[in-house]
Curated annotation (Swiss-Prot):
Gene3D superfamilies hit by this protein: Metallocarboxypeptidase-like (3.30.70.340), Zn peptidases (3.40.630.10)
Glycan-carrying positions: N386
A GO cellular component entry from the record: extracellular region
Disulfide bonds: C339-C362
Domain of life: Eukaryota
Name listed for the protein in its UniProt record: Inactive metallocarboxypeptidase ecm14
GO molecular function, one term: zinc ion binding
Gene: ecm14
């Protein structure tokens, strides 16, 4: 385990020599065209060019940031990732979204949902969010009359305007120095008490492009080789590897040869959901840097392996940076050359096309011609399947992070007619996660089945039937729960509730990361077999980290590099608060406590 002074010396040496390498560890994958779940072949990472940034900060911060920037390979044109700069806006963004808006249409019954779904399919509209109360849709202003003309009279006047000028919001969210302003009634950062800059880590000040994420992952592997590996879990259509952290450390003397109980956390299934990618990275950073300092986190990494995949859709994520900020699918070719891409969360093999997947490749929810038609889902499934067959992993938990709408969804997604056999456990943990989030930042997340849209009761049978604007079959959630028997499987839709949608401002990265990291700790507590009865919520409700006091649960790069006071570090490890509550009027819940 690196001591802070060791890390400082090593990274200073790195800075002056310009050399950092990390050899990917773990098992490789088969060629994506392989039709069978067979043995894997190793796959390596391509090298990245590294460039040094000019100093512009104080001496210690400059040294810290320069080391990181040199290792990550951030060129001068990309300094706006940490400090917004005057890069020109791609003209394609303006031409594509110049007249677009986002409408919220209220729905009241299954008939209205079905009518709206048909109109969306006819006009090839982009559904941003849908639930039992409303549907958020992106469309051009000139298409609004056509949409309303296809809807029943009951839906003619139930819409409200969420985003009036989408192209402007895209521009301001990517280039905040050019005048990005929060809505006056914005609630996305309320009750947090801090901004991303408080973390002191350059990486989480803003969203990061894929090459930077990859270099950052290599950096952490080189710093913490005792419990961190860099592995590949799949291959994309364009030939990129899908990188992941594998975290875990067996206690000394442990000779157990049983498969390691494993939790998998993924983000970025949909390319435009940048907050999901940043949140997976934040969770990984906390687990990695707290190992050996936080006894509960150390136990979690000793008892379980953790697979964290910032994005399972690197092709789409790169495209959302370079060409189209709101791109959703992967970049795989389809039967229509002008409509590429498959929706990765409709492409998994369990109950594929459960409720009539949109068959047109131009649909944002297009699931391909058959199950596992996408390169990414097929190769990830092969990797996960082989992990279980080779007795390397026993998947016990799965978190699939998305945005937006602040929901915690449990199986099944494809239908409400099938009740999951572990429903009681799923609901118990889901409500525990929701409570942890509420006590972290006072944000409310709704717990529900992933199948639920507008739920009605079928006459005669009494069965609950759900009607959705989007198809819900072929989800990663259902596949990991049913096929790999990951007992605690959830899809978590992150911030916000529609004010910004997929264009969530970057100052929400750290608050969102903290509340989901706390959720992971609750998940870990359940996996240790203690359920909800042992949770001590007092740690969340102001014990040592009330408003105005710095939360010590996040070890920043500043501390890793420059804090040489070992006694203070040991003391902070003993006295550490594992959850942050940063509002004076926190909930004073009784009963459970965490750890």
């Amino acid at each position: 385990m690196y001591r802070p002074d060791h890390v400082f010396v090593i990274l200073c040496a790195v800075f002056f020599t310009g050399q950092v390498t990390a050899v990917p560890a773990g098992t490789g994958i088969t060629h994506p065209h392989s039709p069978q779940l067979g043995p894997f072949e190793p796959v390596g990472f391509a090298s990245q060019t590294q460039t040094q940034l000019a100093p512009s900060r104080g001496p210690f911060t400059w040294l810290r940031d320069s080391v990181i920037e040199r290792i990550w390979g951030i060129d001068k044109e990309k300094q706006s990732l940490s400090k917004p700069g005057p890069r020109p806006v791609p003209e394609k963004s303006w031409s594509r979204y110049g007249s677009d808006i986002v409408l919220r249409i209220e729905v009241h019954n299954a008939e209205e949902v079905e009518a709206l779904a048909e109109a969306v399919n006819i006009l090839f509209l982009d559904v941003w969010d849908s639930n039992e109360n409303y549907v958020d849709i992106r469309l051009a202003k000139e298409v609004v009359p056509s949409l309303l003309g296809l809807l029943p009279q009951s839906l003619q006047k139930t819409h409200t305007l969420l985003i009036e000028d989408l192209s402007k919001m895209i521009y301001e969210s990517q280039y905040p120095s050019r005048g990005f302003k929060h809505h006056k009634n914005d609630q996305t950062t309320r009750h947090t008490g801090f901004q991303s800059s408080d973390v002191g880590d350059l990486f989480f000040d803003n969203y990061q492009p894929f090459p930077v994420i990859l270099q950052w992952m290599r950096l952490l592997v080189s710093m913490f080789p005792s419990h961190v590996q860099l592995i590949n879990v799949g291959v994309t259509h364009e030939g990129r590897d899908i990188p992941a952290f594998r975290l875990g450390a067996r206690p000394s003397g442990d000779q157990n040869e049983e498969p390691r109980k494993t939790v998998m956390i993924v983000g970025g299934s949909h390319a435009r959901e940048w907050i999901s990618t940043s949140t997976v990275a934040y969770i990984a950073f906390q687990l990695i840097t707290e190992f050996g300092n936080s006894p509960p986190i150390t136990k979690l990494l000793e008892d379980f392996d953790w697979i964290l995949v910032p994005t399972i859709n690197p092709d789409g994520y790169v495209y959302s940076w370079d060409m189209d900020r709101l791109w959703r699918k992967n970049r795989q070719q389809t039967g229509l050359p002008f409509c590429p891409g498959i929706d990765l969360d409709r492409s998994w093999g369990y109950e594929w096309d459960g409720q009539g997947t949109r068959a047109n490749p131009c649909s944002e929810s297009y699931a391909g011609n058959n199950a596992f038609d996408s390169m990414e889902t097929r190769t990830i499934a092969e990797w996960a399947y082989n992990q279980t067959q080779n007795k390397q992993s026993d998947f016990v938990g799965f978190l699939d992070l998305h945005s937006y709408s602040q929901q915690i969804l449990y199986p099944y997604s494809y239908s409400c007619s099938t009740v999951p056999p572990t429903l009681e456990n799923l609901e118990e943990l889901a409500f525990g996660i929701a409570k942890a989030i509420r006590m972290t930042n006072q944000e409310t997340y709704v717990v529900k089945s992933a199948c639920e849209g507008v739920v009605t009761t079928e006459k005669g049978t009494g069965q609950r039937v759900s009607t959705n604007v989007e198809s819900t079959g072929g989800s990663a959630l259902d596949w990991f729960y049913h096929q790999l028997h990951a007992k605690y499987s959830y899809q978590i839709k992150l911030r916000d509730k529609g004010m910004y949608g997929f264009l969530l401002p970057p100052e929400n990265i750290v608050p969102t990361g903290r509340e989901i990291f706390n959720s992971v700790l609750v998940l870990g507590h359940f996996l240790l077999g203690e359920g909800a009865n042992g949770l001590e919520w007092s740690f969340l409700s102001g014990s040592g980290s009330a408003a105005g006091k710095e939360d010590d649960s996040s070890r920043t790069f500043d501390r890793l590099f420059f804090d040489n006071n070992e006694e203070q570090l040991e003391k902070s490890a003993d006295d550490r608060d594992y959850f942050s509550v940063v509002e004076e009027d926190v909930y004073q819940d009784e009963g459970w406590g965490l750890w």
